[in-house]
């Protein structure tokens, strides 16, 4: 085998170190810095000739800097004769701009996919894309992992008396249904109307939640406005408790204030993005899952088998 190396972008150093610890391999050395005008400079500090290389870099805030850094690292590795380059992107930025939702707007998720390929990325490994069709924006393999396995273990450890799964909106029904099926639980739907960006008005509950411990499932939590309003609606319908599982803890704007003052009892997120500690937030690591996927990709083994 050619051997492989793992490098970290500045947004995911701790995440990459955890992956390397699981795989018992050293983290690759790269000198990443910024010039005084903000331009990013990258130098790969060890040979990668003929190696399969994995770059670990989430492209959350600051999204533009982290995305550009990933592309520049890719170019540096390509010019250093790496055999293949896999972008391990725990959080795929710009995924919410996946279609023309209004006149004269871009499809930025597709533009970003084009940039990945143009830079020289051969494969992408990510988790819980906001829209599954983004995989079709690429002409290279894309492994979209599911955070549900990690949430499943944690929820089982809670020994909830009467659990039920909820989708926080109509668009998330497929994700919630998949989770409910894995857990062997029933499902309800929170029906809401989004009036404008980062604001949501909960309209009603489809299904019975009285006396249930409700578990909302979503791909991300941003300002937490949707989650908190949904929790209020669920409790108004008689839910005993409400927790939410969201793979990506974006947690921008008034997110922490919303959580502090809202009816949501617990928010469970993963470490695809860094987050500030909060009494209502539980952070679960998905680095071991990514480590196993990296191992399987390198050895040409099935990734899908992890989720069957």
PLM segments and residue spans:
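PRPP-associated nucleotide enzymes
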Residues: 1-308
């Amino acid at each position: 085998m050619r051997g492989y190396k793992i490098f970290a972008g500045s947004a995911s150093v701790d995440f990459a170190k955890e992956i390397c610890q699981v795989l018992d391999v050293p983290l690759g050395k790269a000198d990443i810095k910024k010039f005084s005008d903000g331009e990013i400079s990258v130098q790969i500090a060890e040979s990668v000739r003929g190696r399969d290389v994995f770059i670990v870099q989430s492209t959350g805030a600051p999204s533009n800097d982290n995305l550009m850094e990933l592309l520049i690292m890719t170019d540096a590795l390509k010019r250093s004769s790496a055999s293949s380059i896999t972008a391990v992107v725990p959080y795929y930025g710009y995924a919410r701009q996946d279609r023309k939702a209004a006149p004269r707007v871009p499809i930025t998720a597709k533009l970003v996919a084009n940039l990945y390929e143009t830079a020289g990325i051969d494969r992408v490994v990510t988790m819980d894309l906001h829209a599954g069709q983004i995989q079709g924006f690429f002409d290279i393999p894309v492994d979209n992992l599911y955070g549900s396995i990690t949430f499943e273990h944690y929820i089982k450890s809670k020994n909830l008396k009467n659990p039920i799964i909820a989708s926080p909106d109509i668009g998330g029904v497929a994700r919630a249904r998949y989770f409910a099926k894995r857990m062997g639980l029933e499902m309800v739907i929170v029906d809401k109307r989004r009036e404008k960006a980062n604001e949501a008005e909960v309209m009603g509950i489809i299904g019975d939640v009285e006396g249930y411990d409700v578990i909302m499932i979503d791909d991300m939590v941003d300002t937490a406005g949707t989650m908190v309003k949904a929790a209020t609606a669920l409790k108004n319908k008689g839910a005993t408790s409400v927790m939410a599982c969201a793979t990506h803890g974006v947690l921008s704007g008034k997110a922490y204030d919303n959580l502090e003052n809202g009816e949501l009892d617990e928010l469970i997120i993963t470490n695809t993005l860094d987050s500030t500690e909060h009494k209502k937030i539980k952070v679960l690591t998905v680095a071991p899952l990514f480590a196993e996927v990296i191992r399987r990709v390198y050895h040409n083994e099935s990734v899908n088998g992890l989720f069957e």
